């Protein structure tokens, strides 16, 4: 499920491995790696899909949120924790308030429909998985 022939917006776990951390984050890449390497050993790993970093970047670019972020951060004193907290809250709200572009929404809806097609009562979990979350000098909890 890609965007006009460029990078995919959604990737299935069985398409992923540890070489894909930069595309889908550590948790998603690990789930893909487990499906690939442990399913044949009888370990049950639930199927699923990940939205890609490219999908997120496209969302920010096409909606104009990225420009608003740059403008806000240019005016923010990065040494002032209070200003940073306010800027972070504003950025989160912009992201929450901005609808997905139809292409991304359709990719996620299609993947969800495919995943739930076999079980009308299926349960789902939504997890964050930042592309740099497992680096020793970075924390991206909640991204």
Describe each region flagged by the PLM.
Residues 1-143:
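N-terminal beta-alpha lobe that positions the nucleotide/phosphoryl donor
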